[in-house]
């Protein structure tokens, strides 16, 4: 195998697959990237056996072939080189030669036969979606997934299809983010797919490369193809909790809140929360919202803003950082907050097809 490619393009190519490569694994070849060259094309593949990615680019191929190279060391080397073009050559599965100007390096390598094959998704059900829209849907929901491995199913993002609508949901049980869109699939088709957060984060990175993304659906896998990059991931097994009772909660009070002002006030008052509980009291009185937090070790913070509230005094407590996350992922300056009492969740919406839920906290004084 022998090819020549520009340093910048090679660096970008490795960067696209680098995040999939596991930092530590009992299977040495998984720390490698598979490089295949043929017909003036290079194919780079990386996998951790759950998430796999493949990138294809044009290059000057002098000899077809394949080799696997330690990914991180290769990436680090390419970043340090200064010449415009780089030559990579390999005659066996034991050593790859990297030449840049007068510099020459040899990296221990392995053969293609040791590298896991990328799952075949060509016969899977597929549909297309605007890449920026796909990226936006995952960005606005993935922040809410659980980071606790003990809550296995909640560490992924749900992609649900029903009646020609694709719904994406992330939740950790304390907050929930949901967004949906119409897709070009038979309305009779339905299915639920729980995508690992690592795969979701990679899809977000790659989804701005092309106008359209193609999504492939299989019972145990899902794939996304965007531009010259294909990502295939196994799905998380298990049943995603039924969230319909929470999002269908009828709120007796509907309020319009100015997002930027509320973000600023929440950041201020959050400095006075207890590190173990992080609770801010929202007190609604006619025409005003007052935010209060106090901590015996810090002190007390109290701020207020004008709101379109006309009822009796209503108090509810929320985690300010969860509330801030939701506000930061809203697209409008004016958001709607629906509440009923101190015990039921708050429902936050804007003019888009998104909905956020935040569970209340116990009202108390520290």
UniProtKB/Swiss-Prot annotation:
A molecular function GO annotation: 3'-5' exonuclease activity
Species of provenance: Chlamydia muridarum (strain MoPn / Nigg)
Annotated Gene3D superfamilies: 3.70.10.10, DNA Polymerase III, subunit A, domain 2
Keywords tagged on the record: Cytoplasm, DNA replication, DNA-binding, DNA-directed DNA polymerase, Nucleotidyltransferase, Transferase
InterPro entries: DNA_clamp_sf (IPR046938), DNA_polIII_beta (IPR001001), DNA_polIII_beta_C (IPR022635), DNA_polIII_beta_cen (IPR022637), DNA_polIII_beta_N (IPR022634)
A biological-process GO annotation: DNA strand elongation involved in DNA replication
Family named by the database record: Belongs to the beta sliding clamp family.
Name of the featured protein: Beta sliding clamp
Pfam families found in the cross-reference section: DNA_pol3_beta, DNA_pol3_beta_2, DNA_pol3_beta_3
Gene Ontology CC: one annotated term: cytoplasm
Residues of the signal peptide: none
Gene name, Swiss-Prot/TrEMBL: dnaN
Subcellular location: Cytoplasm
SUPFAM superfamilies xref list: DNA clamp
Subunit structure: Forms a ring-shaped head-to-tail homodimer around DNA which binds and tethers DNA polymerases and other proteins to the DNA. The DNA replisome complex has a single clamp-loading complex (3 tau and 1 each of delta, delta', psi and chi subunits) which binds 3 Pol III cores (1 core on the leading strand and 2 on the lagging strand) each with a beta sliding clamp dimer. Additional proteins in the replisome are other copies of gamma, psi and chi, Ssb, DNA helicase and RNA primase.
NCBIfam families: dnan (TIGR00663)
Function of the protein: Confers DNA tethering and processivity to DNA polymerases and other proteins. Acts as a clamp, forming a ring around DNA (a reaction catalyzed by the clamp-loading complex) which diffuses in an ATP-independent manner freely and bidirectionally along dsDNA. Initially characterized for its ability to contact the catalytic subunit of DNA polymerase III (Pol III), a complex, multichain enzyme responsible for most of the replicative synthesis in bacteria; Pol III exhibits 3'-5' exonuclease proofreading activity.
